Structures are given as structure tokens and as C-alpha cells.
Amino acid sequence: MAPAGQTTYQKDERVLCFHHEILYEAKILDLRHTDPDDRKSPYEYLVHYKGWKNTWDDWVPQDRLRKFTEENRELATTLRREAEAALRQKSTKTSLKKKGGSDHSSARGSEERQTSVPGRGTKRARDNDIEKEEHFYTRPSVRIVMPDNLKSLLVDDWENVTKNQQVVALPAKSSVNQILDDYLKEERPKRTGSSEVDVLEEVVMGIRDYFDKSLDKILLYRFEREQYRVLRKRWESETADKGPLDVYGAEHLTRLFATMPELIAQTNMDLQSTNRLREELSKFTIWLSKNSNHYFATRYVTASNEYIEKSRGVPNPAPGTATSRLV
């Protein structure tokens, strides 16, 4: 954040500005303090969106603006494409629903990791479950950018584990901790002030926390649980402070981002905070996509017959939704 009395953006500067969930090219026409009597109050900016009528000119707070950099322009393009794809998907689902089809879908492979087995209960309990589910689906969707090459890697990962009975060689060549540290090292210098750096570090800390809590509950396929059981036993017996963040890598981290929209949807964050988190997470997935050759495993290990037999006896965790199993 700029020091009191200074501004991060200038009049006539070319910028990118958020309007709802999309970044648009804009120009700053004017700026002023939010409190005319307080020279230390934050600035707000009058922006004109390129190609829009003047009636859309608007005073916006600084947190809706982004510098007109190549990286932010790429993010703007990606966000627009994601929004267009979501709109087409929504249109297709609406059409299917009118024809009697289901409007709920799940990512490939998620069923094996997250399938819930409903038990018997009273009608009131079942009604409450239905009410909770309906409430979940009425919440605003949180779309995180998932580049095509990451989607392909997730599909390959699913096939390697569930069909080919292979596991990722662990420890990964780059652990989750190492990947996030590399991202911080590269991203910090690009942030314009201390508040931007604080947001970045807070988001990365949250990713670490989510991964640590969710790995054994929602990110592992059944076939991988024997591998995790052996690793966990080793962590508990060793004095070295090691854990999932030090051993697992890009494959399982990307699985986390595939489930992140559901996790975020079940939080109580306001719209502004949700949009900012979505932006930060999308920046990371774009960065990981560009560096995928460096971080993702080049080979999987074919499991032995002994491992296959043992994997059949390792139970799944308690069933439930992704977030309920994080508790």
C-alpha cells in the first residue's frame, strides 16, 4: 500500500479494473481521497472502461485496480475465457434440466475420493440433509482458473493411479512446500506494496494449511492409502519434523485446487474477499501451469503385488462432503 498522501495509480494511467469477476482495460480519469477532509484517507479512482459508454464511468476503490502488466493482462484473458466457458456450461445445464436431465456434475475421478454413502435416518434428518444440499447449490459458484495442461495432467494422474495401479514416486522431486516457496520468491517482487505482499503470504499460508488438513481426507485415491499409511507411520516414529507438505508434490497440490471451489463455497467470506482469493489462486494455477514441466512427476511407480493386496485392506476415511471431512 502506498504511504499516506501518496497514490499507487496516477491520472491518465492505463490500468486493468475488476467489474464483477472480470478484469477490463480502463483509464484513470481522476482520483480523490475517500474523505475530502482527511489527506491520509485512501484514494478512489474514476475509471473509464475501454470501449464502454461514458455512463459506465465509475469511482472505484484501489483494490479493484491492477497494473497494466503482461502478467495481469494474461490473467484478464484467462478470467474472461473461464467466464465465457461457465456461461456456456450453465446454458447447457439449463437446457438439459428442462429435458429432465440432471444439472449437477462432478470432476472425473472425484467420485472415488469423495463418494458419500448415506445411512438410514429419520425423515427429518433426510429433509435437513436435502435442505443443506440445496443451500450449498444456491451459493455463488467460485471458479478458479485451471489451465488446460493442468486438467490433462489431472486426467493422466487419475488414470495412472486408478487404472494402471501406479503411485507417484515419493518424496516428490519438488515438495508442496518447495513449490510454494518458489512461487513466493518469484511473486513477491511483483507486488506494489506491503499490503499486497501480506495478501500473497496469507493466501500461500492458507494453501499450506488446507493441503495439510485435507490430504488424507479428500485428496488421496483409495489405491494410494497404503502408501500414505506407511509414510505417516514413518513421520510419527522419526524425530525430524516432516509431513505431507515435505513429501507430496504438484500432483496432489493440483488435486487440491480442483476441489478448492467446493471448499471456498462453504466458507462465510464476503463477495469481495472471495473474488480476491479467487484471483490469487488463479494466479498461482497459471504460474504452476507455466512451470509444470519442472514440478510434475515424469514417471509413476508400478505397485508390487504385495502393495496391491495391502491397499485393499486400508479403509477410507469417514464419508461426507469435502469440507465436513476437514474438521
From Swiss-Prot:
Residues 138-312 form the MRG domain. It is found in: Nucleus. The keyword Nucleus applies. InterPro entries: Chromo-like_dom_sf, Chromo/chromo_shadow_dom, MRG, MRG_C_sf, MRG_dom, MSL3_chromo-like. Residues 100-114 have a biased composition (Basic and acidic residues). One of its GO terms (molecular function) is methylated histone binding. Its main location: nucleus. Component of the NuA4 histone acetyltransferase complex. This is Chromatin modification-related protein eaf3. It comes from Emericella nidulans (strain FGSC A4 / ATCC 38163 / CBS 112.46 / NRRL 194 / M139) (Aspergillus nidulans). The gene is eaf3.
